[in-house]
Structures are given as structure tokens and as C-alpha cells.
Regions:
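Post-signal-peptide N-terminal segment of Sec-exported extracytoplasmic proteins
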Residues: 33-68
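Beta-strand-rich structural segments
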Residues: 71-82
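Short flexible loop/turn segments that cap and initiate beta-strands
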Residues: 83-95, 104
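Short, solvent-exposed, Trp/other aromatic-anchored flexible loops in extracytoplasmic proteins
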Residues: 110-135
Length: 157
């Protein structure tokens, strides 16, 4: 009998804390989208596009980028050699982004150096939700060129 009383009292206390509004359901984060990768011989080109709101303030500051849901960052790296022993290659990156309505933006790409690493970064503005197609032309030092195209979806955070 005493066991039932303690159980009933415990349930009553637990339920007393349930009187407020139910918490809002969590908004699921959009799934992480993989980087786009292109291999040409022993050269690997990797491109990543993400909303700058996902960057930490420190990273955004280091990249010289304003954080925001509607600002998308394109990060491109050109590497040569076997994985884990790759060296950065200088290149000229030309990039455009096109949304589903056919609106096209040129992305101004700039060099981003960190130690021995060399990447290229640029931003574009978008409306949300949106699907963006990225078209890149990569011209490596020495004149070899290649293209890359990939699509990513972006949602309000």
C-alpha cells in the first residue's frame, strides 16, 4: 500500500510540472550536403557550398564573410597528389550560380591562404528555400582547365 502511495505521489509531482505550454517541436536541420569532387589524373577539385549562417563567427571573420541565412559561400580547393599527401595548386576559378527561376549571378572568387593550404572563396545571395546550380571553370597554373557543375538545396534555418 505504501508503495502505491509513493508511486501516486511521484506521478502527481511529475505531472504538476507539465502544466505549461508544450515546447515547440524542434526544427530539423537540413541534411549536410556532401562536397562536389572532380578528379582529373592526380588532381582533385573539391567544392563546398553552404549558408554562411552555419559558420562560426570566428571562421566567418577569418574568411571575411558576413554570416546570414540568405548568403551562400562557395569554397573550392584544387589539390594534387595522393590523398593525405596532397599539395595545393594555384588556379583561377570562375563561378556562376543559377536558381530555379533562371536568375544567374557571377561569384567573385578570391584566394584564401592558411599555412600551406590555398583555397578559393566567394559568396552569392539567394531567396529561401532555393535550389542553386553552381557552374565552375578551373584553370590551373600552366593552362590546364576543367569544369565542374553541381546543385545544392538551401532552406531557412
Amino acid at each position: 500500500m505504501r508503495h502505491r502511495f509513493v508511486l501516486a505521489l511521484s506521478l502527481a509531482v511529475a505531472m504538476a510540472g507539465c502544466g505549461g505550454n508544450a515546447p515547440a517541436p524542434a526544427t530539423p536541420a537540413p541534411p549536410a550536403q556532401p562536397e562536389a569532387v572532380s578528379k582529373i589524373g592526380d588532381v582533385t577539385i573539391r567544392a563546398t557550398a553552404l549558408q554562411t549562417a552555419a559558420l562560426t563567427p570566428e571562421v566567418a571573420s577569418r574568411y571575411g564573410i558576413t554570416r546570414g541565412d540568405r548568403t551562400v559561400m562557395l569554397l573550392v580547393g584544387v589539390r594534387q597528389g595522393p590523398e593525405m599527401q596532397e599539395t595545393a595548386l594555384p588556379a583561377t576559378i570562375t563561378a556562376t550560380v543559377t536558381n530555379l527561376s533562371g536568375q544567374r549571378q557571377q561569384i567573385a572568387m578570391r584566394e584564401l591562404r592558411s599555412g600551406d593550404l590555398l583555397d578559393y572563396v566567394g559568396t552569392a545571395e539567394t531567396s529561401l528555400p532555393d535550389t542553386l546550380r553552381f557552374d565552375l571553370t578551373i584553370v590551373r597554373e600552366g593552362g590546364a582547365s576543367s569544369t565542374m557543375q553541381f546543385t545544392r538545396e538551401f532552406y531557412p534555418r
